[in-house]
Design a protein with these regions (language model features):
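Active-site anion-handling motifs in enzyme catalytic cores
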Residues: 1-330
């Protein structure tokens, strides 16, 4: 089977599992308020958001309001929920459950506290506790009155999460639910995208010079984000963002994903240590050579979902090995 057709086949299977699982988690909900929208240049977070939008549309659940991470205070979330008393609360999926990123950690704590006596759905996450204190904070927050439905996206995260939520379930990453992507044909054999943040693995390979991460918007997006960021820093201004139409956040995410896909599509083979570069690369029919990140996120996900379905992903033990493997195939 060609890589493009193979990708379409396993993507359809993973998408089906996500939609079915989240359908059970949201139950008979008719509307939702989503918190912890990541207004950040990371393309992976935007792909997750677009996947969430697609699932809500398929389930017939309105997205009534969105609260970005930087606006996720107890006061802002509380006032937003009072505007939508019947809405189910969704917390954005991703790879930040456990305190690895303090802004997302605090947003999740505030969201769980503000949502007492509501149904709260945590979309699929990777779980990595950075400290006992972070784990204890989340344990207490998960005990808030109401119904908490938690999904995690790999078997290792499920084991970690069961201590906090014994009913947690396993679902694929929600980015698999993104609408079909259009990618130009490759213009070179290999395209490299590597992390430059705290999750980056050791990168001794000399061939990495000049290759980049995708943590940078284009100029127009950077200017727009700077304006939003200035408002985020003003307590009185944060509530403004919960009144922004959800479609605005979706357009922001679409621009970021388009930028990421255009970068990845240049190569016939993609070499990366980013989970969503791996996922998006598969979506556009590319072969992927993966290097695990610093906390084992990629291998855990591959072991749980992609390997059993025969996805065209090859793992390398280091960046040096990955580059040698990529060059040997060209």
């Amino acid at each position: 089977m060609a890589e493009g057709a193979q990708g379409a086949a396993f993507t359809a299977e993973l998408r089906k599992q996500v939609v079915t699982g989240l359908g059970h988690m949201f139950g008979d909900a008719e509307s939702s308020v989503w918190i912890d929208f990541s207004d950040h240049s990371n393309v992976g977070d935007s792909a997750i958001w677009l996947g969430q939008v697609q699932v809500m549309q398929e389930l017939g659940i309105e997205i009534a309001a969105v609260v970005p991470t930087a606006a996720c205070t107890l006061a802002v979330i509380g006032s937003t929920l009072r505007r939508f008393p019947d809405a189910t609360v969704g917390i954005q999926g991703g790879g930040n459950f456990g305190g690895l990123y303090s802004n997302h950690h605090q947003a999740r704590l505030a969201g769980l506290q503000a949502s007492a006596n509501r149904t709260v759905v945590q979309a699929p996450q990777s779980v990595h506790f950075v400290s006992d204190a972070a784990k204890d904070e989340l344990r207490q927050a998960c005990r808030a009155p109401g119904r908490l439905a938690t999904a995690v996206r790999d078997e290792f995260s499920l084991k970690r999460m069961r201590d906090l939520d014994p009913a947690a379930i396993l679902l694929p990453d929600i980015a698999h639910c993104i609408a079909p992507l259009t990618a130009p044909p490759p213009v070179k054999a290999v395209q490299i995208l590597r992390r430059t943040d705290r999750e980056a693995p050791p990168a001794q390979a000399t061939g990495l010079q000049g290759n980049r991460d995708w943590l940078r918007d284009d100029r127009l997006q950077r200017l727009a984000w700077s304006a939003r960021s200035a408002t985020y820093r003003v307590p009185a201004g944060r509530s403004v963002f919960s009144h922004v139409p959800p479609a605005v956040y979706t357009r922001i995410a679409q621009r970021r994903v388009s930028r990421g896909v255009a970068y990845l599509a240049k190569g016939q083979t993609i070499v990366t240590d980013r989970l969503h570069a791996m996922i998006l690369g598969l979506h556009i029919g590319r072969r992927v050579i993966a290097v695990d990140n610093a906390i084992g996120k990629l291998r855990a996900y591959h072991h749980t979902w992609l390997e059993p379905l025969g996805a065209p992903v090859t793992f390398a033990g280091s960046w040096d090995d990955a580059l040698r493997l990529a060059r040997s195939d060209t």
